[in-house]
Each structure stands twice: as structure tokens, then as C-alpha cells.
């Protein structure tokens, strides 16, 4: 009887393996790929053509999936001059609705509490002046308000309780906290390491405010810890991950990295930090309990970009842009063993990436 039970359990595990699904945007090809990973092989199930103008590159940039998994959302960053937010059905991968946002809308996420979508307007090609976060009701696809933040905001992420939204301003080097309920900026933190600045050699009389705020950190991403009051920021210009204590609202640690950290994510179990090192085409994995860098995994091509981690904290899916006319590639990394398991080619300049679902 015991042997029969054992055989049945083994058979169940073999037959009912987990499948993982995610969406990845190819910014230079105006396509989005639906990928499936079966635990061994990563494959492209569908390539969806996006945008309205076949002769123009509209730049699919940011991706997110709503909490119930019924819809996915895409920002088209290139506009005339304003970009768009497009809503798609996960059942058909067809357009449901759209709305116009600000200049170069980029990363975004939906609050599980308010149901609103919070999208940064990166304003890549505009003047170096404060931009905004657009707040959208995804049910009606109506932009409710734009909240003024810093210069070139990026990395819109929301706390696990759905109450706070964070973004970083790349050119002004600031972390912004928005109250998801009141839709107002509640706190701003300067991320520069002022201990390294020689203030005695600064000529303040000839320096205006915008010059003083030009960032050496150049933060590009922010992620709150899933169950601790800690925020992690990718310092792309300073080659570091900045840890911020959200209770004291102070920098608590600066973790040196390889060159050009770009995106950073925390595993849902709170144990691991994953960061793309864009300038060297690698992905770093840290143990958060010890603070130790476990490994730098070389990606399959150049220019590492975005990260999506599976809800079971087993796998990190990494979009890698490639250079020139190369196809973009998505790598899947086993987090515990820090090994690259498989990859798949998609359209050119793989960028925005969002996990959809796990399925037996």
C-alpha cells in the first residue's frame, strides 16, 4: 500500500507540473510576447503586434497585469507628443480600451486597495523639469489626476498593502512616496551620498537649483520589501543598491554592485534581491538575511533590463535588450541555485516584463 501511495504521489508531481506565464515587451519591434515556462523550457506562445501606426515605432515600454489576472496593460511611450496606456484582455490578447497619458509613460502598477493604476511619465525627450505620475481608473480607462514629482520619474511600485506608491526621479536623484488614497506626495528623499561631496569646492553663487539637483545616483528603479518597512533603489549612476528605512525615511545602507544596476526586485518570500546590471549584461542575486552577493549570472546577450519573479519565489525572468539588430532575449534563472536554466528570443529591445499566472 505504501509503495502504491508513493508511486501515485510521484505520478501526480510529474503529471501536474507548474507552468508559468508572463508578458514581455519588445520596444523596437512594437510587439509583446506571451511566454510559457514549464520548469525546464521557456517558449513563446504568442507574439502580439501592438500600436496603431505600422510605419512608426510607438515604443511599448511598461507592462503590468491587474491583480485578478483578467487584463494586462501596456504603455506606448512614443507619442505625438503624448503616449498612451492600452488595456488588453488576457483571454484574447486583444485591445479592450485605451487612454492618453503624459510624455513617455513608462512603468506602472495597480493598487490592490484603490484599484487605481499609477504610471510614471518618464519624459525621456523633454526638458529636464519635474514630470508626474498619472493615476488611472482601469475600469473606465480614465485619467483621474497627474501628481507632480521629479525629473524623469521611473520605477512605479506599490507596497504589498496597496497604500503607498513609490517612484524615483532619475535626473533629480529623489525618492517619492505617494499616498495611494489621498493621491498626494507624502514624502520626498534626496538619495545623493553627501558624505562624498566636497562642498568647499562648490561655487554656490553661480549655481541655480536645477544644477544643484543634477543627480550622480541616477536612480532608475524602486521596490518596497513585501513584509518589511524597507525600500530598495537601483542607483544606476553610482553602481549601488540604496536601502531606505521607510519608518525613519533615511538611507540605511548602500550596497555596491557591478556597473549599471537598472531594475531591482525582491522575491515574494522576502529572502532574495535580484538586480539587472545593465552595463555588464549580468543579473545579481543577493541573500537579504546575510546581505551577501550570492552570484552574478551572465545573461544570454547584452543590456540586461527588467525582472519578473514567480509568486513561488523560485524563478527570475529577465529581459535582455540585445544591441543593434539582435533579437531581444528572455532568460529564466533558478534563484536558489543561481543558474540560468533556459532562454527564448523575442522581438528587438526586450524591456518591460510582467508575470501573469502560475497554472497546473
Where are these regions (language model features)?
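Predominantly soluble domains enriched in secretory-pathway, periplasmic, or organellar proteins
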Residues: 17-360
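Sec-dependent N-terminal signal peptides
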Residues: 2-13
Amino acid at each position: 500500500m505504501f509503495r502504491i501511495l508513493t508511486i501515485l504521489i510521484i505520478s501526480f508531481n510529474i503529471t501536474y507540473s507548474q507552468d508559468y506565464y508572463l508578458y514581455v515587451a519588445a520596444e523596437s519591434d512594437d510587439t509583446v510576447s506571451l511566454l510559457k515556462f514549464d520548469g525546464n523550457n521557456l517558449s513563446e506562445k504568442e507574439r502580439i503586434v501592438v500600436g496603431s501606426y505600422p510605419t512608426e515605432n510607438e515604443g511599448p515600454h511598461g507592462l503590468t497585469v491587474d491583480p485578478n489576472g483578467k487584463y494586462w496593460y501596456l504603455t506606448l511611450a512614443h507619442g505625438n507628443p503624448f503616449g498612451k496606456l492600452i488595456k488588453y484582455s488576457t483571454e484574447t490578447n486583444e485591445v479592450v480600451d485605451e487612454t492618453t497619458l503624459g510624455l513617455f509613460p513608462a512603468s506602472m502598477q495597480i493598487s490592490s486597495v484603490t484599484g487605481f493604476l499609477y504610471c510614471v511619465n518618464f519624459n525621456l525627450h523633454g526638458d529636464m523639469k519635474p514630470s508626474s505620475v498619472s493615476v488611472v481608473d482601469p475600469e473606465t480607462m480614465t485619467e483621474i489626476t497627474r501628481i507632480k514629482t521629479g525629473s524623469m520619474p521611473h520605477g512605479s511600485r506599490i507596497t504589498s498593502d496597496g497604500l503607498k506608491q513609490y517612484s524615483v526621479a532619475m535626473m533629480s536623484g529623489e525618492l517619492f512616496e505617494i499616498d495611494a488614497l489621498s493621491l498626494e506626495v507624502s514624502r520626498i528623499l534626496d538619495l545623493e551620498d553627501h558624505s562624498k561631496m566636497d562642498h568647499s569646492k562648490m561655487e554656490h553663487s553661480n549655481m541655480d537649483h536645477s544644477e544643484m539637483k543634477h543627480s550622480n545616483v541616477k536612480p532608475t528603479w524602486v521596490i518596497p520589501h513585501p513584509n518589511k518597512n524597507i525600500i530598495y533603489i537601483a542607483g544606476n549612476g553610482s553602481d549601488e543598491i540604496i536601502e531606505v528605512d521607510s519608518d525613519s525615511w533615511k538611507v540605511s545602507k548602500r550596497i555596491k554592485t557591478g556597473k549599471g544596476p537598472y531594475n531591482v526586485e525582491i522575491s515574494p518570500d522576502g529572502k532574495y534581491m535580484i538586480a539587472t546590471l545593465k552595463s555588464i549584461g549580468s543579473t545579481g542575486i543577493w541573500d537579504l538575511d546575510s546581505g551577501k552577493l550570492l552570484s552574478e549570472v551572465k545573461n544570454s546577450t547584452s543590456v540586461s533590463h527588467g525582472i519578473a519573479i514567480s509568486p513561488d519565489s523560485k524563478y527570475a525572468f529577465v529581459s535582455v535588450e540585445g544591441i543593434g539588430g539582435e533579437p531581444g532575449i528572455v532568460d529564466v534563472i533558478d534563484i536558489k541555485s543561481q543558474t540560468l536554466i533556459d532562454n527564448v528570443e523575442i522581438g528587438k529591445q526586450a524591456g518591460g516584463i510582467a508575470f501573469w499566472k502560475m497554472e497546473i
